[in-house]
Design a protein with these regions (language model features):
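Conserved residues at the C-terminal ends of beta-strands
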Residues: 19, 172, 274
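Short loop/turn segments immediately following beta-strands, especially the blade-tip
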Residues: 214-216
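Accessory, non-catalytic peripheral segments of nucleic-acid enzymes
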Residues: 10-11, 218-373
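N-terminal active-site segment of His-dependent metallophosphoesterases
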Residues: 1-35, 349-353, 361-373
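Short, surface-exposed connector motifs at secondary-structure boundaries
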Residues: 19, 45-50, 265-268
Length: 373
């Protein structure tokens, strides 16, 4: 937020659009909200238009409500801030931009809305003007939905957006960067993503978007993705094998993967180790100082590592077949082969590894099993 005034000046921005979820209504602090509105005030006379989303929904005791904000803070909303306060799409005109009509609405509750708002918006007050919509909703493209991990709300399709009468749609809800362009290459709608990544579900690209809206969209040459996040959150998988038997060798493989992917010194990284390792390898240990030259913070998850037990040799060994370990492996192999689905196989394989660890006198270590199962 503190970098916003400089960005506005540098790019000669005429209006700032915020399509929702600036905060989480259930936990937002007075400090956060006032910092936000103070930053918007510094942009004056450039107008800022806000369309409250499902997380920062509008209600009588919302900081978006002018009277409540004044009672809580002792001051008014900045004069350059405009908030859509109706759950029904309405138009907004700003004296500074008389040739532009802005449209938008607000959420009043944090609940999914199934109405396809965009498909029903076909009539404009002044079609000859530039017409811009702020929409907090879900692109219902299958891949976009899967990667977002979010419930569908105010769903729309690419086809519905491209067929709409709006020259540009500022999109909010998904925390990753997505653009929707017409056949001429002009951008008709875009999610900037969350400006500052905060979790493992926000490892994708995310920007503040700047562009010149014209009739028919934003030309690709006038569309800029600007990163204001000084660091990135990574989720990196590092494959190990039986040859890696000590923590130093494991760290060197992690460091090589960091270099390959371009992890920076200010970044935070969640590292998932996976693969079949020597059965006598119980766990790898790392000192936080090991990572200081590579990144700001790192967490290592070893739950996907599996001991590379030679099950075929155990089953072929006549002596083992008469012992508990051989009988256990044979029984578990039969259970796995007759499992009804992959989820059941995964659980049974974890049970096999737990059992072999116990029979070999090794510590029982948590094995990865998909949380859905």
């Amino acid at each position: 937020m503190d970098s916003l005034p400089e960005l506005v000046r540098e790019h000669r921005v005429q209006v700032v659009l915020c399509p929702g979820d600036l905060w989480d209504e259930e936990s937002v602090s007075l400090e956060t909200v006032t910092h936000l509105f103070d930053a918007f005030e510094k942009l004056a006379p450039v107008p800022v238009i806000l369309a409250p989303g499902n997380h920062d929904f509008y209600h009588d005791c919302s900081y978006y409500e002018p009277g409540y904000y004044e009672r809580k803070t002792g001051r008014r909303h900045p004069s350059n801030v405009r908030v859509f306060t109706s759950p029904v799409v309405e138009s907004l005109r700003i004296p500074e931009l008389p040739h532009v009509d802005f449209y938008g609405c607000c959420f009043e509750h944090n609940v999914p809305q199934t109405e396809r708002i965009l498909a029903g918006l076909q009539r404009l007050n002044r079609p000859e003007n530039l017409n811009v919509l702020l929409l907090h909703g879900s692109l219902d493209d299958r891949l976009a939905v899967q990667r977002s991990g979010k419930d569908l709300t105010n769903p729309f399709s690419r086809e519905e957006l491209l067929a709409s009468p709006f020259d540009y749609v500022a999109l909010g809800h998904y925390h990753r960067y997505i653009t929707i362009a017409g056949s001429d290459g002009c951008v008709r709608g875009a999610y900037g993503g969350i400006p500052l990544a905060r979790g493992l579900d926000e490892t994708d690209e995310h920007y503040v978007l700047v562009g010149e809206i014209r009739k028919g969209g934003v030309p690709s040459t006038e569309f800029k993705e600007i990163s204001v996040d000084p660091r990135r959150i990574w989720r990196i998988t590092v494959a190990l094998d039986r040859s890696i038997t000590n923590s130093r060798a494991t760290f060197e493989r992690i460091a090589a993967e960091f270099r390959r992917q371009g992890v920076g010194k200010d970044d935070m990284v969640f590292i998932e180790l996976e693969g079949l390792v020597h059965p006598d390898t119980e766990a790898f240990f790392f000192d936080s100082q090991d990572f200081e030259s590579l990144c700001f913070h790192a967490v290592v998850d070893q739950s996907k590592l599996e001991p590379d037990y030679d099950l075929a040799s155990i089953l072929a060994d006549e002596a083992s077949s008469k012992q508990v370990v051989g009988q256990f492996v044979r029984q578990m192999k039969e259970e796995i082969e007759s499992a009804k689905d992959d989820a059941q196989k995964q659980i049974l394989r974890a049970a096999l590894l737990y059992g072999l660890d116990a029979l070999n006198g090794k510590p029982i270590r948590r094995r990865y099993v998909d949380s859905k199962h």
